[in-house]
Amino acid sequence: SVDDTKEIIEVLKQRFPDIKGPSTEDICYATTNRQLAVKSMADMCDYVLVIGAQNSSNSQRLVEVAKKNGVSNSYLISDEDDLNIFLNNFNFTDSINIGLTAGASAPETLVQILISKLKRKFEVNLINHEVVKEDIIFNLPKSLR
């Protein structure tokens, strides 16, 4: 995670004062923002579901950040089948809070499909927990316009 990397860099700087590190601009803004959001919502959650591919290090770090911040019930959900397994393996008898986030490359359509599935099974009260406003816009290449 970004936090783990910072800790390692600090130890290296103490041991090697003249060391030159990578620019902090090299870390994807979306990765940093999502990790900050998971940290800030962790104390409100009984579970954290991270939507993303199993081979996505970004998504795996989000699960780790949630666990490190006190949500031991944090899971990577890559598709509807994973969500079904999650829902079938837990007995949700009480009101619970599920934090939902997605890796930087997770398609928004998958996020919406999984939210719809949760709404069909439970009474859902969605709260958009925005920590950082992402206002960076990437233009499509000319060949795709």
Predicted regions and their residues:
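Glycine-rich phosphate/diphosphate-binding loop of Rossmann-like nucleotide-binding domains
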Residues: S1-F16
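Residue-identity detector for threonine
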Residues: T5, T24, T31-T32, T93, ...
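Active-site rim loops that border cofactor/substrate pockets in soluble metabolic enzymes
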Residues: L12-Y47, G52-A53, Q60-D81, I136, ...
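C-terminal functional extensions of proteins
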Residues: D43, Y47-V50, N55-S56, R61, ...
